[in-house]
């Protein structure tokens, strides 16, 4: 009883215990200097924040890895990490994610990345491919610019065995300074800085330390970031004493780092738990902090500098913070190339340049029905196709970005999102021509379909009607009609404009999900009965007033062409098209009555896999394309038991893009402009994540 009473009195003295816990950010510091700055940070924020605002508690640990473990174990909440450690933090069992990113440059031109460079003294006579036997200066073991990037690039040049990695690096260079390395096991890594001190107290730790190692004549090359040069060499005369090593084995002046760098590296980020991570509270705290104590703010406390040392808690070169989009995990934040380099280092992978890597293509299938078709394709092709599953097109795009899948065919709206995420179009679906050697078709027609029995509806009086869409972010079903409506109504509240609708991919509580039938209600895949072209048309037949589809949809589902009970008795003449001038026309006159021309669906992949995907699909369509006479007895790429699985069913063949191998070239300027205008209405969390580093 006394213990309970004592606890209650303690809580009363400190304020409500639950409230303190919920509004407290426990910041992790890795040395005494960081702990001192953290205490100043805590006290300074207390002066400017309201009583119910976020509070800071400082937690000191011996290293960043200990901080990562502490956050995962709910013993701390946040720490700022180099990109290499962001990757480490994101791995199981830690499962942390970036929640706030530092940005550099200026408010007018902010950058959430920096360049990793190899800095040498002018007059030293060697190139990047001649580093063996030289002396090297690194920022720290496992850090991005100082270790992961350069060692990843040099990995296949290291002497075998390459494990342990530190031993191979020690044998490659004649001497090194690698802070945080184990000097007892790998003494050569600490030859230039005895002890390999692992904190900013040490003279050769971090960016400035690696530069000092080079400047003092200890090393021949320093692996740093471009800002390190300008921070430590303010005058051009001083900078002219140094050069950069380029990937093409040339040298350039240090001012030309954009053309001569080892890699583009994402900025340092604050990480938190993926679940119950307090990311909103952390952002509230840091956003207030940059307002009161950021760059160009007067006061005793400075967020991005410290009298105690360099780069404490945050990088001194940071200008401010951006909130990281919620969809962004560590892999999306770091990017495929960076993650691949780090993964190769971890797993000891060194590709054989003579080996044919194009053995199979892993296709991303949406939902149960697509996976069944993909599995059949995989068996039929003898394993040339492998299958990966995801619930939404965006989840598939993310899997392709991360290397968990290689390819899928997408509507133009998703091609736009995939392009913003770094993927490229590889082949286009052709719907009219079977001549697969010609250039791809110009596109198909996006139309608005209504029932003939409902004669009062026209393009100009759709407000208050019930709408049917293929899915949010798809071309004919969303981007084109909603883009046209946006230009007229000048707002994004489409769920208020239409009385009810089914637009798969909308928020579940939206009126644009009220007409959807499931079984996974409003899901952007075939588990929603009203998903896709046929689904949107069925929605019109059974519940809606207008359907936004492609011009062929009505023809493909009337006159007995679709034997399903809801469609078997439908006639083409039961439906009409809405024209933009307010008139209506028969569905056969789509060429004179449509909303816009839409780009054909296209197969997308990563740049590094594009050539393989293209060759495999062109080979496979020879055997399983429209040359197959009877799809009931043999697998057909362009035929589905339900509609439009993996590819559109009306695909005649896949065609080469003839140079239109970027999403901008493939989609065309007009379509890009239309989608860009609609972006302010976008609910795509993946698009938000993929455009984050394009500030």
From Swiss-Prot:
A cellular component term, taken from the record's GO annotations: recycling endosome
Function as written in the Swiss-Prot or TrEMBL entry: Transferrins are iron binding transport proteins which can bind two Fe(3+) ions in association with the binding of an anion, usually bicarbonate. It is responsible for the transport of iron from sites of absorption and heme degradation to those of storage and utilization. Serum transferrin may also have a further role in stimulating cell proliferation.
Tissue: Expressed by the liver and secreted in plasma.
Annotated gene: TF
Binding site for Fe(3+) 2: 411, 444, 533, 601
Protein name, as recorded: Serotransferrin
Protein residues bound to hydrogencarbonate 2: 470, 474, 476-477
Cystine bridges: 28-67, 38-58, 137-213, 156-350, 177-193, 180-196, 190-198, 246-260, 358-612, 364-396, 374-387, 421-690, 436-653, 468-539, 492-681, 502-516, 513-522, 579-593, 631-636
Location of the Transferrin-like domain: 25-347, 361-680
Gene Ontology biological process terms in this record: antibacterial humoral response; intracellular iron ion homeostasis; iron ion transport
SUPFAM superfamilies in alphabetical order: Periplasmic binding protein-like II
Repeat is among the record's keywords: yes
């Amino acid at each position: 009883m006394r213990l309970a009473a004592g606890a209650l009195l303690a809580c009363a003295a400190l304020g409500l215990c639950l409230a303190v816990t919920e509004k407290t950010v426990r910041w992790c510091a890795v040395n005494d200097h960081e702990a001192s700055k953290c205490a100043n940070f805590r006290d300074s924020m207390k002066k400017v924040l309201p009583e119910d605002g976020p509070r800071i508690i400082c937690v000191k640990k011996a290293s960043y890895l200990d901080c990562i473990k502490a956050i995962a174990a709910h013993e701390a909440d946040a720490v700022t990490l180099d990109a290499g450690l962001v990757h480490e933090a994101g791995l199981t069992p830690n499962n942390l994610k970036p929640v706030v990113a530092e940005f550099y440059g200026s408010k007018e031109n902010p950058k959430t990345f920096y360049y990793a460079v190899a800095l040498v003294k002018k007059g030293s006579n060697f190139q990047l491919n001649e580093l063996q036997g030289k002396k090297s200066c690194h920022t720290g073991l496992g850090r991005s610019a100082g270790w992961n990037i350069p060692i990843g690039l040099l990995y296949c040049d290291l002497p075998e065995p390459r494990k342990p990695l530190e031993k191979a690096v020690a044998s490659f260079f004649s001497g090194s300074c690698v802070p945080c390395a184990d000097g007892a096991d790998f003494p050569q890594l600490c030859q230039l800085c005895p002890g390999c001190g692992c904190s900013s107290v040490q003279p050769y730790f971090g960016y400035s330390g690696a530069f000092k190692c080079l400047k003092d004549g200890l090393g021949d090359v320093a692996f740093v970031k471009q800002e390190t040069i300008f921070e430590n060499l303010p005058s051009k005369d001083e900078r002219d004493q140094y050069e950069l090593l380029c990937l093409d084995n040339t040298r350039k002046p240090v001012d030309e780092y954009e053309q001569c760098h080892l890699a583009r590296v994402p900025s340092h980020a604050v990480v938190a738990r993926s679940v119950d991570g307090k990311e909103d509270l952390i952002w509230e705290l840091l956003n207030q902090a940059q307002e009161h104590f950021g760059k160009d703010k007067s006061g005793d406390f400075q967020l991005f500098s410290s009298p105690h040392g360099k780069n404490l808690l945050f990088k001194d070169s940071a200008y401010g913070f951006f909130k990281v989009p919620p969809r962004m995990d560590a892999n999306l934040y770091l990017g495929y190339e960076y993650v691949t380099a780090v993964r190769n280092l971890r797993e000891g992978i060194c590709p054989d340049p003579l080996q044919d890597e194009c053995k199979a293509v892993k296709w991303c299938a949406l939902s149960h029905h697509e996976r069944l078709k993909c599995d059949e394709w995989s068996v039929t092709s003898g394993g040339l196709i492998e299958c990966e599953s995801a619930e939404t097109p965006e989840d598939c795009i993310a899997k392709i970005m991360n290397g968990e899948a290689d390819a899928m065919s997408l509507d133009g709206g998703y091609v736009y999102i995939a392009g913003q995420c770094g993927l490229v179009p590889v082949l286009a679906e052709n719907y009219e021509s079977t001549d697969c050697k010609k250039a791809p078709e110009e596109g198909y027609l996006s139309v608005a379909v209504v029932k003939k029995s409902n004669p009062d509806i026209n393009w100009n009086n759709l407000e208050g009607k019930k709408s049917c869409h293929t899915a949010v972010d798809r071309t004919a079903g969303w981007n084109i009609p909603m883009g046209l409506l946006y230009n007229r109504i000048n707002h994004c509240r489409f769920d208020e404009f239409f009385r009810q609708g089914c637009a798969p991919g909308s928020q579940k509580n939206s009126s644009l999900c009220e007409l959807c039938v499931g079984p996974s209600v409003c899901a952007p895949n075939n588990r929603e009965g009203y998903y896709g072209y046929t689904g949107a048309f069925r929605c019109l037949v059974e519940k809606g007033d207008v359907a936004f589809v492609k011009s062929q949809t009505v023809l493909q589902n009337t006159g007995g062409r679709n034997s399903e009970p809801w469609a078997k008795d439908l006639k083409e003449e039961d439906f009409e098209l809405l024209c933009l001038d307010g008139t209506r026309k028969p569905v056969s006159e789509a060429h004179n009555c449509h909303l816009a021309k839409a780009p054909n669906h296209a197969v997308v992949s990563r740049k590094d896999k594009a050539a393989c995907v293209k060759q495999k699909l062109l080979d496979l369509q020879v055997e399983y394309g429209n040359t197959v006479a009877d799809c009931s007895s043999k697998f057909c790429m362009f035929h589905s038991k339900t509609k439009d699985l993996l590819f559109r069913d009306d695909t005649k063949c896949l065609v080469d893009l003839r140079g239109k191998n970027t999403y901008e070239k493939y989609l065309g300027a007009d379509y890009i402009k239309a989608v860009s205008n609609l972006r302010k209405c976008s609910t795509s969390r993946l698009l938000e994540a993929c455009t984050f580093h394009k500030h």
